[in-house]
């Protein structure tokens, strides 16, 4: 399975995972308490510049953003239908800035670093007896590993339909995608159980 991580030595790469995660959280909070279009536009510009420094070729960088652009387009459409354009622009700018920064963080942080950092941050929650930090880290790692794989599989199924001359419809692609994804999930669950990765205290 592919990772979203990009090898490099940019400033974003050199930042510690904790600094990046905390900065992303703070950035998100600031975005969602602000309604200033100028400030939000500036945040989009800053996030775009940071994303441009991760070391991806322009073509691949834009390709990675395609699902993000589709999400933003849907959000923009719904907001424009029900709100004046100024009000509709606020959530669009927020989402764009946040997704660009999140893309920068995932491109400059390995999955192992993510898991280790989230597990460490979640460790104090174990005192409640309701959560296991290792499980939280494992769940995040699996999500980060599976997202690009699911996107690639969707594209492969789509191309296979085109090659056979079949009409490409989201509904016709969804069933095989779900089946293959569930099979992968079963295989991963079996591997986790076989290796006794989940460690619960008695």
Curated annotation (Swiss-Prot):
Q: What upregulates it?
A: Expression is repressed by biotin.
Q: Which InterPro entries match?
A: ABC/ECF_trnsptr_transmembrane (IPR003339)
Is Cell inner membrane a UniProt keyword of this protein?
A: yes
Q: What is its main location?
A: membrane
UniProt-listed CDD domains: EcfT
GO CC, any one term: plasma membrane
Stretches of the chain forming a coiled coil according to its record? none
Q: Does the keyword Cell membrane apply?
A: yes
Q: Provide the membrane topology annotation.
A: Multi-pass membrane protein
Q: Which family does it belong to?
A: Belongs to the CbiQ family.
Described by its record, this protein's role is as follows: Involved in biotin uptake.
The identity of this protein, by name, is Energy-coupling factor transporter transmembrane protein BioN
């Amino acid at each position: 399975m592919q990772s979203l991580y990009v090898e490099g030595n940019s400033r974003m790469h050199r930042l510690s995972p904790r600094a990046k995660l905390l900065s992303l959280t703070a950035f998100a909070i600031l975005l969602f308490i602000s309604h200033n279009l100028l400030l939000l536009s500036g945040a989009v510009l800053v996030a775009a510049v940071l994303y441009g420094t991760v070391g991806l070729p322009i073509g691949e960088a834009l390709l990675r953003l395609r699902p993000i652009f589709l999400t933003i387009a849907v959000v923009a459409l719904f907001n424009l239908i029900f709100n004046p354009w100024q009000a509709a622009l606020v959530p669009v700018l927020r989402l764009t800035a946040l997704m660009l920064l999140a893309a920068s963080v995932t491109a400059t942080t390995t999955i192992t670093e993510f898991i280790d950092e989230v597990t460490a941050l979640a460790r104090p929650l174990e005192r409640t007896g309701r959560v296991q930090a290792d499980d939280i880290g494992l769940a995040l790692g699996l999500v980060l590993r599976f997202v690009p794989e699911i996107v690639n599989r969707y594209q492969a199924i789509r191309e296979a339909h085109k090659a056979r001359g079949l009409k490409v419809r989201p509904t016709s692609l969804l069933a095989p995608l779900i089946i293959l994804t569930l099979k992968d999930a079963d295989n991963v669950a079996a591997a986790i159980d076989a290796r006794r990765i989940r460690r619960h205290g008695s």
